[in-house]
Amino acid sequence: MVVRSILLFVLAAVAEIGGAWLVWQGVREQRGWLWAGLGVIALGVYGFFATLQPDAHFGRVLAAYGGVFVAGSLAWGMALDGFRPDRWDVIGALGCMAGVAVIMYAPRGH
């Protein structure tokens, strides 16, 4: 269940961050409405991936995903935009990922 959940978080991050990046490229970098439109579609795919999480609680899944989004956005920026995070970015992302682990995978006794 944990492996499936992690895979779904990764897929959601690629769809959401990629979608937002495509919209950014289409509008801010003036690459055109096709890029922005593809981004909107990818953002919709992100929403679908969130519904496939094994945990049934919307608030928990989306709260935990927020941490994945933080770390994933920094990684995306490094891979595609030449962004270099400083130590505070890294510390913050690690803290977010620790929060993801607690929120999603801590034993709850039920």
Curated annotation (Swiss-Prot):
<feature type="transmembrane region" description="Helical">
    <location>
        <begin position="6"/>
        <end position="26"/>
    </location>
</feature>
<feature type="transmembrane region" description="Helical">
    <location>
        <begin position="61"/>
        <end position="81"/>
    </location>
</feature>
<keyword id="KW-1003">Cell membrane</keyword>
<dbReference type="Pfam" id="PF02694">
    <property type="entry name" value="UPF0060"/>
</dbReference>
<comment type="similarity">
    <text>Belongs to the UPF0060 family.</text>
</comment>
<feature type="transmembrane region" description="Helical">
    <location>
        <begin position="90"/>
        <end position="110"/>
    </location>
</feature>
<keyword id="KW-0472">Membrane</keyword>
<dbReference type="GO" id="GO:0005576">
    <property type="term" value="C:extracellular region"/>
</dbReference>
<dbReference type="InterPro" id="IPR003844">
    <property type="entry name" value="UPF0060"/>
</dbReference>
<dbReference type="GO" id="GO:0005886">
    <property type="term" value="C:plasma membrane"/>
</dbReference>
<keyword id="KW-0812">Transmembrane</keyword>
<keyword id="KW-1133">Transmembrane helix</keyword>
<protein>
    <recommendedName>
        <fullName>UPF0060 membrane protein Rv2639c</fullName>
    </recommendedName>
</protein>
<feature type="transmembrane region" description="Helical">
    <location>
        <begin position="32"/>
        <end position="52"/>
    </location>
</feature>
